[in-house]
């Protein structure tokens, strides 16, 4: 099951007209992209490892922007191995600007903390304090927001990093 996609569709079924999904998991959200690729009622933004060297390999490239009615409503921000907070946060800023421009009524965050520097799967270099800043930036969108937990494989740090996102989000 794709919890972010199910939730987005549930919001639409309840009368919302514009939903944004921000996927910050290390791997591209290929399922979510495929579900909404030809639709304009959901903006999908994904920050992820470069699919030229990372799973899923066949989707997640920057030139995949949507099709048909969905053209322009899919934003992939693939990042190189070794991306740290300055690199990653620049992509987050680009994604947040696209979300702000789209003017959704609600935001769903596919929250993966497998971008952590000690995660055995990831090649990104985010630190635990970076997740506070991530939450703060997402909060600055000033949208009703639902977080859906995704990946994270540095077991001892998953809780710390997920809580840091939420604490950053709740700070005013």
Over which residues does each language-model region extend?
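A short helix->loop->beta-strand "cap" motif at the edges of active sites that frequently abuts
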Residues: 140-145
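Alpha-helix N-cap/loop-to-helix initiation residues
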Residues: 85, 154-155
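Conserved alpha-helical scaffold segments that buttress catalytic/binding sites
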Residues: 1-137, 166-167
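Short, electropositive alpha-helical surface patch
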Residues: 127-128, 157-172
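Metal-dependent catalytic neighborhoods of phosphoester/phosphodiester hydrolases
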Residues: 119-122, 155-160
């Amino acid at each position: 099951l794709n919890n972010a996609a199910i939730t987005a569709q549930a919001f639409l079924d309840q009368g919302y007209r514009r939903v944004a999904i921000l996927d910050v998991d290390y791997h591209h959200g290929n399922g979510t992209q495929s579900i909404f690729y030809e639709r304009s009622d959901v903006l999908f933004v994904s920050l992820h490892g470069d699919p030229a060297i990372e799973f899923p390999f066949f989707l997640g490239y920057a030139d995949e922007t949507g099709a048909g009615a969905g053209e322009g409503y899919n934003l992939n921000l693939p990042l190189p191995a070794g991306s740290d907070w300055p690199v990653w946060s620049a992509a987050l800023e680009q994604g947040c600007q696209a979300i702000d421009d789209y003017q959704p009524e609600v935001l769903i965050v596919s929250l993966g903390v497998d971008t952590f520097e000690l995660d055995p799967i990831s090649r990104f270099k985010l630190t635990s304090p970076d997740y506070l800043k991530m939450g703060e930036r997402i909060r600055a969108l000033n949208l009703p927001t639902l977080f859906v937990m995704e990946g994270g494989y540095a077991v001892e740090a998953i809780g710390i990093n997920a809580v840091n996102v939420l604490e950053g989000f709740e700070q005013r």
